Amino acid sequence: MLRFSANLSMLFGEYDFLARFEKAAQCGFRGVEFMFPYDYDIEELKHVLASNKLEHTLHNLPAGDWAAGERGIACIPGREEEFRDGVAAAIRYARALGNKKINCLVGKTPAGFSSEQIHATLVENLRYAANMLMKEDILLLIEPINHFDIPGFHLTGTRQALKLIDDVGCCNLKIQYDIYHMQRMEGELTNTMTQWADKIGHLQIADNPHRGEPGTGEINYDYLFKVIENSDYNGWVGCEYKPQTTTEAGLRWMDPYR
């Protein structure tokens, strides 16, 4: 049976962040993920998770100056100390909240450096993070993102991510495979998820175009959900989409799985 995790950074945006946990539970979710927990008190997050009987499934490493347009710093030479501080913060929250997956947004390709410098920096940072997370029995994830939504993002495809995993050489580094992003960049969703199932550590869903809930676009999620159910993937499926109206009104797609 598929297990869906509500991405509270995108769902239930009609409510204050801490109120979204209760709304997710009321709508039948048993897991939640969110991008950045760092502005919230750990004890407060533990309380809203426990009081709503929710499992925290995923959060991201700190990603630099988000308001200024940064989308990660792992590939930027000269930011290594900041990156390592972010790894420590992510682990501190994961220990307290109980999640076993942390996603790394690698960042936009920086100007002024050679491709070799950028790649070496990224590999070294990911290797450091993976080794630190391995001590905590936590998976490190890297997420390819389409370059239409985030122009200049450094990691945009599955094969690029697979090559990066090989170069880093840590068994707890896997792909966060976002079906929406990869539909925009590659297509071949079924074949990719089937062929590289052992390299996928987390799945996320949204339809295309407009990144709405399943059933609002071109992706055949009825079919893909069967593919996922029949695969070896047994993790959470993160619902990281933009509701086309309200979150509750757009959840009919989930009725067969509640």
From Swiss-Prot:
Stored Pfam families: AP_endonuc_2
EC top class, as a word: isomerase
pH dependence: Optimum pH is 6.8-7.2.
MF-aspect GO terms: hydroxypyruvate isomerase activity; protein homodimerization activity
Activity modulation: Not stimulated by addition of pyridoxal 5'-phosphate (0.1 mM), FAD, NAD(+), NADP(+) or ATP (1 mM each). EDTA (10 mM) and metal ions (1 mM) such as Ca(2+), Co(2+), Mg(2+), Ni(2+), Zn(2+) do not affect the enzyme activity.
Any single GO BP term: glyoxylate metabolic process
Catalytic reaction(s) noted: 3-hydroxypyruvate = 2-hydroxy-3-oxopropanoate
Keywords: Isomerase
Gene null: resulting phenotype: Does not affect growth on glycolate or glyoxylate.
InterPro entries for the chain: HPT_OtnI_isomerases, Hydroxypyruvate_isomerase, HyI-like, Sugar_Epim/Isomerase, Xyl_isomerase-like_sf, Xyl_isomerase-like_TIM-brl
Entry EC number(s): 5.3.1.22
Gene3D superfamilies according to UniProt: Divalent-metal-dependent TIM barrel enzymes
Chain ranges passing through the membrane: none
Induction remark: By glyoxylate.
Active site: 143 (proton donor/acceptor), 240 (proton donor/acceptor)
NCBIfam families: OH-pyruv-isom, OxoTetrIsom, PRK09997.1
Family: Belongs to the hyi family.
Function field: Catalyzes the reversible isomerization between hydroxypyruvate and 2-hydroxy-3-oxopropanoate (also termed tartronate semialdehyde). Does not catalyze the isomerization of D-fructose to D-glucose or that of D-xylulose to D-xylose. Also does not catalyze racemization of serine, alanine, glycerate or lactate.
Subunit structure: Homodimer.
Protein name from the UniProt record: Hydroxypyruvate isomerase
